């Protein structure tokens, strides 16, 4: 990965939180749209590399409630600075669509792709997708708090083809900065970002579920989960594959993540033993 231009993706992963937080937890509990019976969450930001079909998490950051999105991105990129990775393209989801983030990415000269949030009934960004054609244009977004920023928008018509039960033509709008790509290739390219969501699902298979009130312990458990997923990717590419013309042939179905976790569990049990009995308390006489 070092000294090469890489495609990176940044995203936020929300883990539901229930109950009343202790004082040491409060800085890490954020509020978001209700999900799984709660609107309180621990939030973890990750940066993910997509290289030669390999998907690996490079950095993890526990988000504080008062942190801005620009601060979150900065902390993640600082963590991987010693890898000397040049960013070929940065993928972000619509949660990062705001004036400060776009202005900061442009100021840092970082190439990126990000969906536009469509708002308004006729004007605003709604008007961008109502022209019913594929095109490029510039757009200025205004914020009462942060001022304004002008950026390039690409609007592309795509067919749903039955995905999620939807059919027909729809138009997508993206913020694009210094991306060397044909306009019609953009939706397919951006879809690569969704591998980060699959990494979250894999991470959940490995994550230690806990009720601890210690934010550091929670971060440790999430970090271990991502490391286990990275280990699995390494094993697949190194030992569960064969070289061939056009790229390595992977046999991922022969060694799913669950199997690796079972192997690890068996190794731990052989090392420290397993509990096979319990003892009832002795009767206490008064």
Model-predicted regions and their roles:
Residues 86, 195-200, 212, 233-240, ...:
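Intrinsically disordered or highly flexible coil/loop and linker segments, enriched in small
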Residues 30-86, 170-172:
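Electropositive, glycine- and tryptophan-enriched low-complexity nucleic-acid-binding patches
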Residues 66-124:
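Domain-level cores of phosphate- or acyl-group-handling catalytic modules
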Residues 4-18, 47, 87-97, 112, ...:
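Short, conserved catalytic/metal-binding motifs centered on acidic residues
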Residues 108-205:
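An anionic, glycine-rich sequence signature occurring as long contiguous blocks
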Residues 1-51:
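Active-site-proximal, Lys/Arg-enriched surface segment
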Residues 130-158, 205, 228-286:
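A short, flexible helix-boundary coil/loop motif
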Residues 179-189, 204-222, 239-243:
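Short, solvent-exposed helix-loop connector elements
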């Amino acid at each position: 990965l070092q000294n090469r231009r890489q495609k990176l993706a940044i995203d936020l992963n929300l883990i539901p939180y229930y109950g009343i937080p202790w004082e040491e937890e409060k800085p890490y509990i954020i509020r978001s749209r209700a999900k799984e019976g709660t609107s309180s969450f621990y939030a973890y930001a990750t940066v993910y590399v997509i290289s030669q079909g390999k998907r690996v998490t490079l950095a993890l950051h526990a988000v504080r409630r008062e942190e801005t999105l620009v601060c979150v991105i900065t902390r993640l990129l600082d963590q991987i600075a010693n890898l000397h990775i040049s960013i070929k393209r940065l993928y972000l989801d619509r949660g990062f669509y705001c004036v400060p983030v776009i202005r900061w990415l442009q100021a840092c000269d970082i190439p990126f792709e990000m969906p536009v949030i469509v708002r308004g009934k006729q004007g605003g960004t709604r008007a961008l997708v109502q022209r019913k054609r594929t095109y490029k244009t510039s757009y200025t977004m205004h914020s009462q708090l942060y001022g304004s920023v002008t950026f390039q928008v690409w609007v592309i018509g795509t067919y749903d083809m039955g995905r999620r039960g939807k059919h027909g033509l729809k138009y997508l709008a993206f913020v694009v900065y210094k991306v060397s790509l044909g306009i019609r290739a953009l939706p397919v390219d951006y879809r690569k970002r969704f591998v980060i969501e699959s990494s979250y699902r894999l991470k959940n298979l490995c994550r230690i579920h806990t009720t601890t009130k210690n934010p550091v312990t929670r971060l440790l458990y999430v970090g271990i989960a991502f490391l286990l997923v990275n280990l699995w990717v390494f094993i697949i590419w190194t030992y569960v594959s064969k070289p061939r013309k056009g790229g390595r042939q992977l046999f991922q179905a022969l060694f799913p993540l669950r199997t690796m976790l079972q192997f690890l569990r068996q190794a731990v049990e052989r090392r420290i033993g397993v509990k096979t009995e319990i003892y009832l308390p002795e009767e206490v006489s008064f």
